[in-house]
A protein has these predicted regions:
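Short conserved active-site loop signatures built around small residues
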Residues: 1-16
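Residues at alpha-helix termini
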Residues: 8, 65-66, 116, 167
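Conserved N-terminal alpha-helix of the aminotransferase class I/II PLP-enzyme fold
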Residues: 25-79, 107-111
Length: 182
């Protein structure tokens, strides 16, 4: 029911593909940019990389389906992994990640983040005591894949989240191989 497009009288909203957004004047662009700053999730676009009305409607639908405050969509799954990690960590911070992880995620966390003085510690997903032992004052995030990319092993998310809450840490879960039910 969220996707109804009463303006165009269609059952589902039309798919809008655009990289360039057209405006009537520079003044109109500036007004849109001011609105976007005040409400970044409000569907105000001045360039295609910010999304279109289609992505905005998708976010609204997913927000309702997932019963969340907001959903942010990215063009790729790995883009969302990158965004989730980079929105949390800063130089000097640490991440604890389940091993094994998706190869590009390993390269990001093990190699790329080093350049920013961000350390990643990998733990055996079947040994949550090791996870707890590796938490330090610098730890900001526990990163989990469920099921695991290479092994398809399932981790005890309930216990991991309890550990995270106890230590006031955020968790990020890559659910690529799962479904909304995992």
């Amino acid at each position: 029911h969220t996707a109804k497009d009463f303006h165009n009288q269609s059952v589902n909203p039309p798919v809008v593909r655009a990289s360039t957004i057209i405006f009537k004047s520079m003044q109109h662009i500036r007004k849109t940019q001011v609105k976007a700053k005040k409400n970044p999730t409000g569907g105000h676009y001045d360039y295609g990389r910010q999304g279109t009305s289609t992505t905005y409607i998708l976010q609204k639908i997913l927000t309702k389906l997932e019963e969340s405050y907001h959903v942010f969509t990215t063009p790729t799954g790995f883009g969302s992994v990158f965004l989730a990690i980079f929105s949390v960590v800063r130089p000097g911070d640490e991440i604890i990640a389940a091993d094994p992880v998706y190869s590009p995620t390993r390269i990001l966390t093990q190699d790329f983040l080093k350049q920013f003085n961000i350390k990643t510690i990998f733990y055996n997903p079947s040994d949550l005591k090791t996870l707890e032992k590796n938490i330090t004052k610098k730890t900001k995030l526990i990163f989990v894949e469920n099921p695991g990319s290479n092994t398809f092993d399932f981790q005890d998310l309930g216990k991991i989240i309890l550990i995270a809450k106890k230590n006031k840490l955020l968790t990020a879960i890559d659910n690529t191989w799962g479904t909304p039910y995992y």
